Design a protein with these regions (language model features):
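A short, conserved, highly charged catalytic patch centered on acidic carboxylates
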Residues: 1-81, 89-127
């Protein structure tokens, strides 16, 4: 994932941050895997793109669980894009009125060698 973000011109602690601490209630913090295009001002944390990274989501139930986790983080961060990624692919959800679990675009890692597909994904994240 990080080599992909780097190849799109985005770098850690400048454009994205890992494990951004977010206050989620009194004394409770959560740590999304990646926040892209972020502001880490305390108590006002924001990220335009929220990325939840898993090793391998082997079935629909695991994708659903990852989506629900990412959506809760995205709501707190006011994100407009969620990405679930694993060793096979990236699943991109774009917020319309809300995030719809059934409305997404899937990108397999090998497809991103195609310039058009790479640029399509980059444009979705360049917000």
């Amino acid at each position: 994932l990080e080599p992909l973000l780097n190849s799109m011109g985005w770098y850690e602690n400048k454009d994205f941050i890992r494990q951004l601490p977010i206050h989620a209630g009194r004394g409770h913090r959560i740590f999304p895997d990646y926040a892209l295009h972020y502001d880490n001002k305390p108590d006002e944390e924001k990220a335009k793109v929220l990325i939840e990274a898993k090793l391998y989501m082997k079935n629909n139930q695991e994708i659903e669980e990852a989506f629900l986790q990412a959506r809760s983080y995205a709501c707190l961060l006011e994100s407009t894009v969620i990405i679930l990624c694993d060793k096979r692919c990236l699943i991109v959800y774009e917020k319309k009125d809300s995030f719809d679990r059934d409305r997404y675009k899937k990108y397999y890692w090998g497809e991103l060698e195609n310039t058009d597909i790479f640029n399509e994904l980059k444009n979705k994240l360049n917000i």
